[in-house]
């Protein structure tokens, strides 16, 4: 085992919600109105061994925000995966902030039984509000450690 922490890379790009008519933008300091955050679940590295002695991991990610779930495709038999799948998260008025956390859960797909939870991490509502309020067109990426039962998930990789 390599014993490195299992980590997920997320990318975010701030944008406007497409509309039939262009909106009149207020002054730069007054951020309000609807916004879209394009959240990309980029990749995961250092997954743990999940499927018995010989099996690796069949990971997929579920991103949950304001009651809506977004799911990546399942990657088979691996200790790392690249998804680069983008989901559009919308908010009606950024001036009010965001009250919901964003939860990302990693799962191990199983053909014959219930899928197993690998672990998860949360992006706090306050941080989501900051992201939604960032300048339109701005983007960045962040790496998150996957947590299970209060501890960092450690990868197998070999």
What are these regions (language model features)?
Residues 33-38, 59:
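Short structural boundary motif marking the start of a folded domain
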Residues 95-100:
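Short glycine/proline/serine/threonine-rich loop/turn segments at secondary-structure transition edges
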Residues 11-28, 38:
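Intrinsically disordered, low-complexity terminal tails and linkers
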Residues 1-18, 45, 51, 58-60, ...:
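C2 and C2-like phospholipid-binding beta-sandwich domains
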Residues 62-69:
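Short amphipathic beta-strand segments in non-cytosolic proteins
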Residues 36-53:
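A structural motif detector for short, solvent-exposed N-terminal "entry" segments of globular domains
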Residues 30-32, 52-57:
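Short, low-complexity cationic-aromatic patches
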